[in-house]
């Protein structure tokens, strides 16, 4: 199986088929079991991963660093200010140089076009650790978490409430590809990108499931197996924060809203969370919340991705 993935990039959930997503999740589960049992898996012994960060991170940095170490490899942390990128070196040159020294590159940055350019010029696999357009590693962890708690993915309904942002984009594509029903509720003007909606619509049609885009959070959450949200203002949107709080207030995930979901629903949030804004403490700290299991699964999902692309 590894041979079919080796050398590929992972920039978007659309880079994988539904079947491939399931294979990644199966490997992630296997690696998680081995790690819990204390079984060493030095699959990437002698391999180095360059990790470029233009945006601050807790979960992305720790999960990739720990993941590489557990797989026997070496993680190399690089901030934009530490590198020549901050002095105007072209991304193409950075890609060519790093490709001669490392076995893979993970980048967490603002512009999705930067990641695409890096991947175009790099001769080693490039992994999208987050851009303003997608966050595919997060959604691999989310799908792993859903499968662990629900036993399956196909046929479940996932509801997104809030901003049609990068996490929403990756969730729509990933969930649709594995046969889930997808419902997205956003304020007017904050809908997901139309290209993403078209991809998700095509995938749900293939499975015979549904894609719902609405401005009504109750409509989206009704009958949901999984409820997901994110912060109202992402990094780089701080200047819009006050305005966004006003716009998104009706989209808070609270006890009243989730009462419309299935009784055994689970709640996901990529973290960090702002209790009292996009979600209440009642929900995120309640019995239906699996956000910390979700955070842990960043490690296991990314170990699977690293194994397949760099192994």
Swiss-Prot record:
Name this protein carries in UniProt: Ornithine carbamoyltransferase
Binding site for L-ornithine: 166, 230, 234-235
Database matches in InterPro entries: Asp/Orn_carbamoyltranf_P-bd, Asp/Orn_carbamoylTrfase, Asp/Orn_carbamoylTrfase_sf, Asp_carbamoyltransf_Asp/Orn-bd, Orn/put_carbamltrans, OTCase_ArgI
Primary localization: cytoplasm
Residues given in the record as carbamoyl phosphate binding sites: 57-60, 84, 108, 135-138, 270-271, 298
Catalytic activities: carbamoyl phosphate + L-ornithine = L-citrulline + phosphate + H(+)
NCBIfam families found in the cross-reference section: orni_carb_tr, PRK00779.1
Functional note: Reversibly catalyzes the transfer of the carbamoyl group from carbamoyl phosphate (CP) to the N(epsilon) atom of ornithine (ORN) to produce L-citrulline.
Any GO BP: arginine biosynthetic process via ornithine
Pathway involvement of the protein, from the record: Amino-acid biosynthesis; L-arginine biosynthesis; L-arginine from L-ornithine and carbamoyl phosphate: step 1/3
Family per record: Belongs to the aspartate/ornithine carbamoyltransferase superfamily. OTCase family.
Keywords assigned: Amino-acid biosynthesis, Arginine biosynthesis, Cytoplasm, Transferase
GO cellular component, one term: cytoplasm
Source organism of the structure: Carboxydothermus hydrogenoformans (strain ATCC BAA-161 / DSM 6008 / Z-2901)
The UniProt record lists the keyword Protein transport: no
Keyword match Transferase: yes
Molecular-function GO terms, alphabetical: amino acid binding; ornithine carbamoyltransferase activity
Gene3D superfamilies: Aspartate/ornithine carbamoyltransferase
EC number of the protein: 2.1.3.3
Subcellular location: Cytoplasm
């Amino acid at each position: 199986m590894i041979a079919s993935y080796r050398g590929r990039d992972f920039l978007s959930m659309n880079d994988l088929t539904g079947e491939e997503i399931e294979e990644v999740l199966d490997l992630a589960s296997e690696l998680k079991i081995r790690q819990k049992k204390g079984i060493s898996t030095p699959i990437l012994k002698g391999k180095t991963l360059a990790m470029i960060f233009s945006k601050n991170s807790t979960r992305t940095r720790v999960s990739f660093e720990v993941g590489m170490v557990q797989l026997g490899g070496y993680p190399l942390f690089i901030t934009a200010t530490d590198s020549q990128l901050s002095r105007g070196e072209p991304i193409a040159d950075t890609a060519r140089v790093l490709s001669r020294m490392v076995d893979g590159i993970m980048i967490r940055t603002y512009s999705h076009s930067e990641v695409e350019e890096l991947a175009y010029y790099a001769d080693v696999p490039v992994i999208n650790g987050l851009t303003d357009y997608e966050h595919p590693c997060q959604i691999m962890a989310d799908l792993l978490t859903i499968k662990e708690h629900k036993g399956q993915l196909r046929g479940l309904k996932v509801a997104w409430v809030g901003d049609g942002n990068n996490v929403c984009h990756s969730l729509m594509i990933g969930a649709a590809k594995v046969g889930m029903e997808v419902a997205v509720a956003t304020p007017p003007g904050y809908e997901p990108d139309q290209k993403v909606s078209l991809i998700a619509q095509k995938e749900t049609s293939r499975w015979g499931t549904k894609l719902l885009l609405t401005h009504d959070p109750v409509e989206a959450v009704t009958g949901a197996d999984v409820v997901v949200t994110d912060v109202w203002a992402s990094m780089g949107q701080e200047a819009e924060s006050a305005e966004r709080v006003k716009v998104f207030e009706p989209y808070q995930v609270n006890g009243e809203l989730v009462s419309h979901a299935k009784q055994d629903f689970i709640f996901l949030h990529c973290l960090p969370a702002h209790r009292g804004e996009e979600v209440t403490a009642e929900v995120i700290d309640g019995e239906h919340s699996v956000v910390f299991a979700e955070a842990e699964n960043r490690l296991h999902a990314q170990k699977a991705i690293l194994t397949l692309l760099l192994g």
